[in-house]
């Protein structure tokens, strides 16, 4: 049974009216999948918070300590993009724990998904871009440290480069990070990944999919992975207000299928996290995210 991390009490965190982050999607995704019968309630699990030691494998003790004490400056709040509260920290810890536990479920069932996650802009000592703790890094680091796998490939197809993940795993031969992102988009100071494909604004869908097919194959061959982490951000949608690319819902579906089909055919456990999506039309964001779940179900 494919397991899905979701906490109905924490994932949809209250934000000030008019905030541009579409937090409501974290409730709408499971609601829609349940309504259409694509998943069952038995597949959903509420993550149990992992101990602090797990987070210290990725994040600096001083940073975690300040977060726990609520010692967050106004400048840090602006970098996070969220108003600070202890409830927000509880949310971030729970999401990271969910991604780690998805890794364990993926080993058992072939694949697992987190309704949230993909917080790839979080660094060891700081957060930015709606990311405070790095769930991909926490999950992958645990899988590697505990000997569950020897090599992880992260396929990061969010329109924004996962700069935090790149920094955390720089020089780590057991973690291969492939990022295909917008060249002119946030973050404006890029980090160095194992494979970076930086796309110009308004890049055509046909060219996008052609490039992805080529560089995905290159990444799998270079990484020779035992596990895949898929950052499946849907902010590459043509209607996304932050994305600057021209990929249709059909194109995103083809993208997801390319990644998931490849991992499945190689018999590799896969963890999918949702990443970004900032269209004015929330239904388009939710539909695109839901398709990722459906595609995983069809191949695993």
Language model features by range: what are they?
Residues 1-137:
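Metal-dependent C-N hydrolase catalytic cores
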Residues 74-300:
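A general "terminal functional-core" signal
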